[in-house]
Amino acid sequence: MDGIKYAVFTEKSLRLLGKNQYTFNVESGFTKTEIKHWVELFFGVKVVAVNSHRLPGKGRRIGPILGHTMHYRRMIITLQPGYSIPLLDREKN
């Protein structure tokens, strides 16, 4: 899958797993509808809602040169009751 980079496992995202919500970092150019389509197609689940926020890039310094990393988007995907993403269910326990 090109759009989704990886699943996020923070305290908040692990707490949201109990509410059937999964958190992913995605490429910043993708929209909510594109990610919803990809998740439904790839995992075979029904998505109820998609929330997103853009996280800023971090500053990096190499000697006198100041740069930054790319910003990225984090999506919180809510599934219909009865559906789950099997690869991420192990983190729930």
Curated annotation (Swiss-Prot):
PROSITE patterns given in the database record: RIBOSOMAL_L23
GO biological process: translation
Keyword set, alphabetical order: Chloroplast, Plastid, Ribonucleoprotein, Ribosomal protein, RNA-binding, rRNA-binding
UniProt-listed InterPro entries: Nucleotide-bd_a/b_plait_sf, Ribosomal_uL23-like, Ribosomal_uL23/eL15/eS24_sf, Ribosomal_uL23_CS
Keyword Ribonucleoprotein found: yes
Main location: plastid
Disulfide bonds: none
A GO molecular-function descriptor: rRNA binding
Pfam families xref list: Ribosomal_L23
Coiled-coil region(s): none
Any GO CC annotation of this UniProt entry: ribosome
Protein localization: Plastid, Chloroplast
Keyword Repressor: no
Function (record text): Binds to 23S rRNA.
Subunit composition and interactions: Part of the 50S ribosomal subunit.
Family that this chain belongs to: Belongs to the universal ribosomal protein uL23 family.
Protein name (database record): Large ribosomal subunit protein uL23cy
